Amino acid sequence: MAKYTFVKFKINNDFFNWEKCFYAAQPIARKAGIVEIFHGKASDDSSSGACLFHVESQEKMEAFFKDMEKEVAASGHALESTEITCYEN
C-alpha cells in the first residue's frame, strides 16, 4: 500500500531561502524513505508552503522531522504552524 504525507506550514522568511534549505535536506530525506512529489507556495500568499511526500511509513516521517527539527526551523519553516495529513491507497 502506498503512503503519502501532505504537509502545510507557514514560512517566516523568503520562500526561495526556505527552498534552498529544503533542497539541501533531500538526500537525507531520501535515505529515510521520504521522496518529495511536490513542494510550493500558495499563489496568493508566499508565506504559506506545502509539500507532498511519498513515505515508507508515518513513523519514518515523524522520526525525520524530530531528527531534523533544528534544520527545519532554521529554514524559516514555522514549526508551530505545521499541519500534517497522511493518505494511503
Q: Residues of each region from the PLM?
A:
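Short S/T/G/P-rich N-terminal loop/turn motif that feeds into the first structured element of a domain
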Residues: 1-67, 80-89
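Short, exposed beta-strand-loop hairpins at the edges of beta-sheets
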Residues: 71-75
